[in-house]
Amino acid sequence: MDASHPAVYPVGVPPTAVDPPPRVRMKDYEGMPSTLGGLVLRSGQFACAVTALSIMISIPDFSSVTAFCYLVAAMALQLLWSVSLAVVDGYALLLRRTLHNPVLLSLLVIGDWVTSTLSLAAACSSAGITVLIDSDLAQCAHNHCGRYEAAVAMAFLTWFLVSLSFFFSFWLLATR
């Protein structure tokens, strides 16, 4: 019985690499730090915070309610945070650099988390007072309910944009 025998042809073995090849990251998504989307998010946060702050400051007696004072303070902090990070994002875009340093990303994540929490708390407390004045006390004729509602809406929009920035930064930090 003749069985066929496999023929063995010598094949050169490729040299083994000392270091494994670098991991290939997926492309950076718009909205992450040092992208154009990130700059747009920061600019939107700034614009919404400025609008909410301007509306509240234009109301003469806003300081009589603690929740409205808290909204003004939270939007002022958000304004400073957003404009400073918009400048950093713009500078990184001009130099074509990435902001993927783990220490810097940790700072961005913690800062966005704190400012988004403050913005949400301020927006919710101000919305509660606005509903109280409008619906429960029915004193909109004596107060500026339309302005209060507009400022609260801008505060919620600010919170939404900051939350998006937080999630993009956190995602980038978690996948490093």
Curated annotation (Swiss-Prot):
Its main location: membrane. PANTHER family: CASP-LIKE PROTEIN 5A1 (PTHR32021:SF1), CASP-LIKE PROTEIN 5B3 (PTHR32021). It is a multi-pass membrane protein. This is CASP-like protein 5A1. The keyword Membrane applies. Homodimer and heterodimers. Residues 1-45, 89-102, 173-176 are cytoplasmic. InterPro entries: CASP_dom (IPR006702), CASPL-5 (IPR045009). The chain crosses the membrane at residues 46-66, 68-88, 103-123, 152-172. It comes from Selaginella moellendorffii. It is found in: Cell membrane. It holds the Pfam family CASP_dom. GO terms for cellular component: membrane; plasma membrane.
